[in-house]
């Protein structure tokens, strides 16, 4: 298969290099189009107010001065002279669990591939690495990815489906298997952090993500905690269909006494 690989950690991140190598070793034709620097948290942002520069690093790699969404959009609308068969985004250097997906550039790169008509997978490693501990197990996540891509080749999923894959940070031999999950969610984020710059002005840092809230059985949080690879099918239609009837009644009450023109 012709695989387009992107990420949000940047073109030089270890995860994307290990993923691309693993896919090539599995027999796929791989093109990497990724941001020139870390663009974590970029979500679905698309650059519209300035031109975007893309630098070809080698025959199989482009570095783009833009967001993850920019990278996939450019690759599929003119940068490449062929059409890939699938988009694989990752390997992210931390998990994208629950409502992380709203902010994730990793997931958004896959989502852009789906917007433009291709099957898409986002792969994240739920890292446990701390100073002095074992290095992150990117090879485990890469092994999961090549198996998922192989299955998609022979057994495609519905056209509106994106797979959000979160892999525990353990060796493949320690893994308990795959588990299909739903997104959990977190408590409210911690307060922003304030500091004072050298000129005396207050500056702000976004605070840490909130702790797990909805993280019980069936969620992506629970699967990873129990050493399963979490596969969550997501899609881009944000309509809350269960609320349509209730909101229709609410809107009827809202408009009941308004003098609309006939």
Curated annotation (Swiss-Prot):
Belongs to the SurE nucleotidase family. Its EC number is 3.1.3.5. Nucleotidase that shows phosphatase activity on nucleoside 5'-monophosphates. The gene is surE. This is 5'-nucleotidase SurE. InterPro entries: SurE (IPR030048), SurE-like_Pase/nucleotidase (IPR002828), SurE-like_sf (IPR036523). Gene3D superfamilies: Survival protein SurE-like phosphatase/nucleotidase (3.40.1210.10). HAMAP family: SurE. Keywords: Cytoplasm, Hydrolase, Metal-binding, Nucleotide-binding. GO terms for molecular function: 3'-nucleotidase activity; 5'-nucleotidase activity; exopolyphosphatase activity; identical protein binding; metal ion binding; nucleotide binding. SUPFAM superfamilies: SurE-like. It comes from Xylella fastidiosa (strain 9a5c). One of its GO terms (cellular component) is cytoplasm. It is found in: Cytoplasm. Binds 1 divalent metal cation per subunit. A divalent metal cation binds at residues 8-9, 40, 92. Pfam families: SurE. Disulfide bonds: none annotated. Its cofactor is a divalent metal cation. It catalyses: a ribonucleoside 5'-phosphate + H2O = a ribonucleoside + phosphate.
């Amino acid at each position: 298969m012709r695989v387009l690989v992107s990420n949000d950690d940047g073109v030089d991140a270890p995860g994307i290099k290990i993923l691309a190598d693993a896919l090539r070793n599995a027999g796929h034709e791989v093109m990497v189009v990724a941001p020139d620097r870390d663009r974590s948290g970029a979500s679905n942002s698309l650059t519209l107010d300035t031109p975007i520069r893309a630098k070809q690093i080698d025959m199989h790699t482009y570095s783009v001065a833009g967001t993850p969404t920019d990278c996939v959009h450019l690759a599929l609308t003119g940068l490449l002279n062929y059409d890939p068969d699938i988009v694989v985004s990752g390997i992210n250097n931390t998990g994208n669990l629950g409502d992380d997906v709203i902010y994730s550039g990793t997931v958004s790169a896959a989502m852009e591939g789906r917007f433009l008509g291709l099957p898409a997978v986002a792969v994240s490693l739920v890292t446990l690495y701390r100073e002095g501990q074992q290095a992150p197990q990117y090879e485990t996540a890469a092994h999961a990815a090549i198996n998922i891509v192989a299955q998609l080749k022979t057994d495609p999923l519905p056209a509106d489906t994106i797979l959000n894959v979160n892999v525990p940070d353990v060796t493949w031999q320690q893994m308990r298997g795959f588990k299909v999950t739903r997104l959990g969610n977190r408590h409210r984020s911690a307060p922003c952090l304030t500091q004072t710059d050298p000129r005396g002005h207050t500056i702000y840092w976004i605070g840490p993500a909130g702790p797990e809230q909805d993280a019980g059985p069936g969620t992506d949080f629970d699967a990873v905690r129990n050493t399963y690879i979490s596969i969550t099918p997501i899609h881009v239609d944000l309509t809350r269909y269960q609320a349509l009837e209730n909101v229709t009644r609410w809107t009827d009450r809202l408009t009941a006494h308004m003098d609309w023109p006939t």
